[in-house]
UniProtKB/Swiss-Prot annotation:
Start and end residues of each PTS EIIC type-1 domain: 106-459
Protein name, as recorded: Probable PTS system sucrose-specific EIIBC component
Keyword vocabulary terms for this entry: Cell membrane, Kinase, Membrane, Phosphotransferase system, Sugar transport, Transferase, Transmembrane, Transmembrane helix, Transport
Domain of life: Bacteria
Provenance organism: Bacillus subtilis (strain 168)
EC number(s) reported in the record: 2.7.1.-
Membrane-traversing stretches: 111-131, 147-167, 177-197, 209-229, 245-265, 288-308, 329-349, 360-380, 388-408, 412-432, 434-454
GO BP of this protein: phosphoenolpyruvate-dependent sugar phosphotransferase system; trehalose transport
Name of the coding gene: sacX
Residue numbers annotated as active site: 25 (phosphocysteine intermediate)
Biological role stated in the UniProt entry: The phosphoenolpyruvate-dependent sugar phosphotransferase system (sugar PTS), a major carbohydrate active -transport system, catalyzes the phosphorylation of incoming sugar substrates concomitantly with their translocation across the cell membrane. This system may be involved in sucrose transport. The EIIB domain is mainly phosphorylated by the EIIA domains of GamP and PtsA/YpqE. Negatively regulates SacY activity by catalyzing its phosphorylation on 'His-99'.
Pfam families named among the record's database cross-references: PTS_EIIB, PTS_EIIC
GO CC term (a single one): plasma membrane
NCBIfam families according to UniProt: PTS-II-BC-sucr (TIGR01996)
Residue ranges occupied by any PTS EIIB type-1 domain in the UniProt entry: 1-86
Length: 459
């Protein structure tokens, strides 16, 4: 079935020669195309499994939903690569240039998307442990708790290495070298930042410079900057070193030069940048909390349209790793925006007279309550416009509430109902306020959508 859909999709997208590159995120298939006029959008939207389509940053994006898109992607890529062509195969890179801010955010998003399953699994496990402790399902010190704790913490311990691997691949470099550089920056001999209150890092004296033996566990910006520089060094060496020596010489020089630069120059600088970003966000949260919650809750769904919301993971990881913060106060806001989309979708389901729209609206709304919003956003609310505005209103109200009562989480990557597992560890009050915010966001979006109404096409 997926193979047939892939063949039709490729044909309706203008054929092999109209496609420059193919990529995907957790719910969407993305085509970078030469000529948008060759795409039969209406026919694609009528394909089995397609929940909606849209253009963003020059990419034609098709929503299939989580668990399906990766299967479709494999078949589409196989058909695309094996189909006959009168033109040479193009490099799989996006052809359109984005402005620097958009390009940076998109790159962050593309780096973190492949890591989401690991983050989600660990986040749910951490939440499960929190629930076990809150409800006393196991005795304190139980070997089961210790075992689950080991399993749940692994992804976050290895997160810098996973990011280094993914970033190197995104930058067109050797991903294993990226993992090595990330491993260097989280080496056990380097002091974990969380220990700063009780320990002082030793230092290396080189050429009059005092280099602190400080690790960067949980700090994403130093990892990203180091791997980016590494990719440039590796590419430069590939243009100089003879091919007969590149297997040995290029990795050796790349790791040695990047490692020294990372410890001496880049990471201290990147760490300062990360601290400034974190302190700025904390300042905004402390001094413009409710207004900031309303603003971020209102606009978050608009950011989701581009898929760039995944770029926030780097910021959230930094907040959790910071010993002076240690919690994630952003993800409750994102969650309010997501469940608001579900509330708006339920209003559409209740009000529409179209049977085809009802069939989409109800399951897509329920999916939004589970934290996956693309089906309801692109399949229903955005097409009708006003429900999307209603959801933004609900997200703003819910976002303001969770900031006002200071709802926090101990992980990221989860919203909606699954997020309960990562708010429970902070106590019953945190959980109750989260659920109140959940209801406020969903109900206010529902009411706002009913009030605004929407115009639908006749069947």
């Amino acid at each position: 079935m997926h193979k047939e859909i892939a063949k039709e999709l490729l044909l309706l997208a203008g054929g092999k020669n109209n496609i420059i590159s193919i990529s995907h995120c957790t719910t969407r298939l993305r085509f970078d195309v030469k000529d948008e006029t060759k795409i039969d959008i209406h026919a694609i939207e009528n394909l089995q499994g397609v929940q909606g389509t849209f253009f963003r940053y020059g990419l034609f994006q098709i929503i299939f939903g989580a668990g399906v898109v990766n299967k479709i992607y494999k078949e589409v890529v196989h058909v695309w690569e094996t189909a006959p062509s009168e033109e040479p195969v193009h490099q799989k890179k996006a052809s359109r240039k984005l402005n620097p801010a958009a390009a940076f955010a998109k790159t962050l998003s593309d780096i973190f998307v492949p890591i989401i399953p690991a983050i989600t699994a660990s986040g749910l496990l951490m939440g499960l442990i929190g629930m076990i402790k809150v409800f006393h399902w196991f005795a304190a010190g139980s070997p089961w708790i210790k075992m689950l704790d080991l399993v749940s913490s692994t992804a976050f311990i290895l997160l810098p290495i996973l990011v280094g691997f993914s970033a190197a691949r995104q930058f067109g470099s050797n991903p294993y070298l990226g993992a090595v550089i990330a491993g260097l920056l989280t080496h056990p001999d380097l002091l974990d930042p969380s220990m700063l209150g009780s320990k002082t890092p030793s230092s290396l004296d080189i050429w009059g410079l005092h280099i602190p033996m400080m690790g960067y566990q949980g700090s994403m910006i130093p990892i990203l900057l180091s791997v980016f520089v590494m990719s440039k060094i590796e590419k430069l060496l590939k243009s100089i070193v003879p091919k007969s020596l590149d297997v040995v010489i290029i990795p050796f020089i790349t790791v040695m030069v990047t490692g020294c630069l990372a410890l001496i120059v880049m990471n201290p600088a990147a760490s300062i940048i990360g601290q400034i970003m974190t302190q700025s966000i904390v300042y905004i949260y402390d001094h413009a909390g409710i207004a900031a919650g309303a603003l971020f809750g209102g606009i978050y769904s608009t950011i989701v349209l581009s898929g760039l919301h995944h770029s926030f993971y780097a910021i959230e990881a930094t907040l959790l790793a910071n010993p002076h913060v240690g919690v994630n106060f952003l993800v409750p806001i994102w969650s309010m925006a997501n469940v608001a989309q579900g509330g708006a979708g339920l209003a559409v389901f209740l009000k529409t007279k179209q049977s085809s729209l009802k069939k989409i609206a109800l399951p897509a709304s329920l999916t939004a309550f589970l934290g996956i919003v693309e089906p309801i956003v692109f399949g229903v609310n955005l097409k009708l416009i006003r429900p999307f505005i209603g959801a933004a209103i609900g997200g703003a109200i819910g976002g303001a509430y969770v900031v006002a009562v200071q709802v926090v989480a101990n992980s990221y990557g989860l919203t909606g109902i699954p997020m309960i597992s990562i708010v429970l560890p902070f106590g019953a009050a945190n959980f109750v306020h989260y659920m109140i915010g959940f209801l406020i966001a969903a109900v206010s979006a529902f009411i706002a959508t009913l009030f605004l109404g929407f115009k639908e096409e006749t069947e």
